[in-house]
Amino acid sequence: MHALLFDLFGLFISEQSRTSFETLARTVGVEPDVLLPAYRGENRVEYDAGTIGSREYWARVAAETGVDIDWQAALAADLAALGAKDEAMVSFARSLNRTGFTMGMLSNIPCDFVGWTRWHNPWSDELFDPVLFSCRLRLAKPDEEIFAVALARLSQSAGRKLAPEDVLYVDDSPKNVEVATKLGFLGHCFENLEALSAKIEAV
């Protein structure tokens, strides 16, 4: 293994909690169980891939739920629902960075979330190169093409051509890890820091 490629949310920033989602649902005026399919389905894939913006995304959610939604208020509530930084994981990444590993980040994220994420998490640009956001690539995981782009960018950072088997890909989504390993990457489905540390030592 010569390089590491990490997801962001669910590893370094906690996933949106049920309580946060319920607060978001109240803001937009939709019952949580009604909101969830429209919020998480194909609309979110396109939103993450940057093929639609926040206004169109929330217009689609409104159409599917039958509720008139103020998209700007919804966006603000969506940003407020983002999770907290995991200090232990960030410290672990710093220790890995000092060992000389090439480390990249690949995150599914809408364009309107990028500025907020970078502002509140400046360590991401300090520790990872490249930092790749799906919306700027016009692709979203688990699309196979996004992994090819990430591998090429990791190779640039490493100063040598990397093969998929040179890279350990870490994500909390089993589907994303499944696709990456099918393409030849080493894979680890993240559950906790202890298991991740053991995996890195093993490879």
Each language-model region and where it sits:
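Asp-based, Mg2+/Mn2+-dependent phosphohydrolase catalytic module
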Residues: H2-F6, L106, P110-C111, G115-V203
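N-terminal helical cap/lid subdomain that shapes the substrate entry/recognition surface
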Residues: H2-S91, R98-T99, P110-V114
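Surface-exposed alpha-helical segments enriched in charged/polar residues
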Residues: S91-R94, R98, A152, E178
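Structured helix-beta-strand junction loops
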Residues: T99-G100, V203
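Extracellular ligand-binding interfaces
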Residues: M103
